[in-house]
Amino acid sequence: MSKPVDHVKRPMNAFMVWSRAQRRKMAQENPKMHNSEISKRLGAEWKLLTESEKRPFIDEAKRLRAMHMKEHPDYKYRPRRKPKTLLKKDKFAFPVPYGLGSVADAEHPALKAGAGLHAGAGGGLVPESLLANPEKAAAAAAAAAARVFFPQSAAAAAAAAAAAAAGSPYSLLDLGSKMAEISSSSSGLPYASSLGYPTAGAGAFHGAAAAAAAAAAAAGGHTHSHPSPGNPGYMIPCNCSAWPSPGLQPPLAYILLPGMGKPQLDPYPAAYAAAL
């Protein structure tokens, strides 16, 4: 792109006045030296000059500037526009796909509640009652998580457990046992056992579920589920008093591959069959 004909150059400063002759001399002595390297060396040499050595060039630069102002009274320095830099990439270590945030807000409003609990007091999203009572805040967070990851029935149970645990002095302990009960009931989901072998959801909370089962048995109704001996992927509701002792034999899980027969060791002990 050619420059316009009426382009007015800036007046030279003291360094430009001094380097004009020095650049020509250095280029003749080093014909293969790049212009950027010449400028770098000239700048270093200019800094080494004393004030008395720079004075003649400073005066010459002032004279040229005064002459430039007389010739071009309306001159205004307009720097060249630099090309716009590319937009910075997302600051997040794990970028969220486009449109995922809106889908999550529409399908799972509980995510907003969970985000509000973790936003802190500075954001103004957490009620003062939850800030004053951490047990209620933990119960509300657990209920919000249950609404997202569990079906409606399990979500209702989680909400009831959270409400009951909020008024108890041992709310955090009770909340853990109630969540264990919810996890055992959620094992009936279609994605819980798609390969035909038992899930590990109930076993992970074995100790906590025993206490929850005993409390629920006194009130009556369904307390927990047992895996069916005939079909390991099917959970049978049970209202027995408690789970078998963990010291007898922990529940086992087997993966049946093509070409393999039934395992010799029964993965479910006789205590499960007796409890049915």
From Swiss-Prot:
It is found in: Nucleus. GO terms for molecular function: DNA binding; DNA-binding transcription activator activity, RNA polymerase II-specific; DNA-binding transcription factor activity; RNA polymerase II cis-regulatory region sequence-specific DNA binding. PROSITE patterns: HMG_BOX_2. GO terms for cellular component: nucleus. One of its GO terms (biological process) is positive regulation of transcription by RNA polymerase II. Its main location: nucleus. The keyword Oxidoreductase does not apply. Pfam families: HMG_box, SOXp. Disruption phenotype: Expression of ameloblastin AMBN is significantly reduced in the tooth germ of postnatal day 1 (P1) molars, but ASCL5/AmeloD expression is not altered. Residues 8-76 bind DNA. May play a role as an activator of transcription of OPRM1. Overexpression of SOX21 can up-regulate the OPRM1 distal promoter activity in mor-expressing neuronal cells. May play a role in ameloblast differentiation. This is Transcription factor SOX-21. The lineage of its organism: Eukaryota, Metazoa, Chordata, Craniata, Vertebrata.
